[in-house]
């Protein structure tokens, strides 16, 4: 399981160093094979171990092509998907198109989300968190959740 928030500097080539605490799990789960795509609702990237991505991709591909929402999701998630290999130094090269989509500069934030990571520009992540704190706490539907 991937959890936690890690600020990371991209190098001049646009490579992201996977935090050390995740490297063994990534090796065990997917032999360093990852898939990067864009989030269809936010200006962030989604990074999946290959087996988890295969499950997501199959679900998205099973949606009806006649649905406008399904086509949009297919275009965003599958159309922007890139296969990436973690190199021997634990780095991933983030393609330029993905960096542009997510407004990456030098500083990014890697956010563990269970079976995947979200990767945000640090400034967009900070703005998102400020917006969360400013929102009213509408927890309808989550009454039984124990935190």
Regions found by a protein language model. Name each.
Residues 3-16, 20-40:
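A positional/architectural concept
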Residues 123-147:
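Short, Lys/Arg-rich amphipathic alpha-helical interaction segments
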């Amino acid at each position: 399981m991937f959890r936690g928030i890690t600020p990371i500097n991209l190098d001049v080539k646009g490579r992201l160093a996977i935090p050390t605490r995740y490297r063994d799990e990534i090796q065990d789960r997917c032999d360093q094979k990852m898939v990067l795509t864009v989030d269809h609702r936010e200006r962030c990237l989604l990074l999946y171990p290959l087996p988890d991505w295969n499950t997501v991709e199959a679900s998205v591909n099973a949606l009806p092509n006649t649905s406008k929402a399904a086509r949009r999701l297919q275009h965003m998630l599958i159309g922007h998907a890139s296969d990436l290999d973690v190199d021997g130094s634990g780095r991933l090269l983030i393609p330029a198109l993905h960096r542009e989509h997510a407004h990456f500069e030098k500083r990014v934030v890697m956010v563990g989300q269970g079976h995947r990571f979200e990767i945000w520009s640090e400034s967009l992540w900070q703005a998102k968190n400020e917006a969360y704190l400013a929102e009213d706490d509408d927890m309808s539907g989550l009454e039984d959740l124990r935190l």
